Amino acid sequence: MDVFMKGLSKAKEGVVAAAEKTKQGVAEAAGKTKEGVLYVGSKTKEGVVHGVATVAEKTKEQVTNVGGAVVTGVTAVAQKTVEGAGSIAAATGFIKKDQLGKNEEGAPQEGILQDMPVDPDNEAYEMPSEEGYQDYEPEA
């Protein structure tokens, strides 16, 4: 029985030593894991901040580009609409065809929207002067 007890004692010492080594190993591994997670987190944060700043800058550039294209497109559509309305008015007899597209002096009339200054980088747009408008008086 003495041999049995001695064997159990040695086994116990071995288990304690293994547990101690395991505890030390786990603590060391946990420390390294924490360092790794913090490092990855800090690099990810830097990357996210840089990425967000880059995306914000690119978005601003694209909005400026798209804004200019939209203003130009809207101006072109509006001009075509005015021209189309003039053609319809002439076709239906509201105005004479020889008056279509001419001002009071008989010169070709520029589109009202073409006289409007368009600056896509500037948020304030000026309205065209009242001189660009003509009063419409239907023929009776």
Curated annotation (Swiss-Prot):
Q: Where is the composition biased (Acidic residues)?
A: 118-140
| Residue span of region Disordered | 100-140
List of residues that carry Phosphoserine: S87, S129
Q: Please tell me whether the keyword Transmembrane helix is annotated for this protein.
A: no
Where does the record place the region Interaction with SERF1A? Answer: 111-140
The protein's location, in the record's own words, is: Cytoplasm; Membrane; Nucleus; Synapse
Q: Where are the transmembrane segments?
A: none
Which GO cellular component terms, listed alphabetically, does the Swiss-Prot or TrEMBL entry include?
Answer: axon terminus; cytoplasm; cytosol; extracellular space; membrane; neuronal cell body; nucleus
On the tree of life, the source organism's domain of life is Eukaryota
Q: Which residues form a coiled coil?
A: none
Sites binding Cu cation sit at D2, H50
Name a single GO biological process.
regulation of dopamine secretion
Q: Which UniProt keywords apply?
A: Acetylation, Cell projection, Copper, Cytoplasm, Membrane, Metal-binding, Nucleus, Phosphoprotein, Repeat, Secreted, Synapse, Ubl conjugation
Q: Which residues get modified to Phosphotyrosine?
A: Y125
- Post-translational modification N-acetylmethionine, affected residues: M1
Alphabetically, the GO molecular function entries are: copper ion binding; cuprous ion binding; identical protein binding
For this chain, the Swiss-Prot or TrEMBL PTM comment says: Phosphorylated, predominantly on serine residues. Phosphorylated on Tyr-125 upon osmotic stress. Ubiquitinated. The predominant conjugate is the diubiquitinated form.
Q: How does it assemble?
A: Soluble monomer. Homotetramer. A dynamic intracellular population of tetramers and monomers coexists normally and the tetramer plays an essential role in maintaining homeostasis. Interacts with UCHL1. Interacts with phospholipase D and histones. Interacts (via N-terminus) with synphilin-1/SNCAIP; this interaction promotes formation of SNCA inclusions in the cytoplasm. Interacts with CALM1. Interacts with STXBP1; this interaction controls SNCA self-replicating aggregation. Interacts with SNARE components VAMP2 and SNAP25; these interactions allows SNARE complex assembly and integrity.
What does the UniProt function comment say about this protein?
Answer: Neuronal protein that plays several roles in synaptic activity such as regulation of synaptic vesicle trafficking and subsequent neurotransmitter release. Participates as a monomer in synaptic vesicle exocytosis by enhancing vesicle priming, fusion and dilation of exocytotic fusion pores. Mechanistically, acts by increasing local Ca(2+) release from microdomains which is essential for the enhancement of ATP-induced exocytosis.
* Assigned protein family: Belongs to the synuclein family.
Return the protein name: Alpha-synuclein
Biological source species = Macaca mulatta
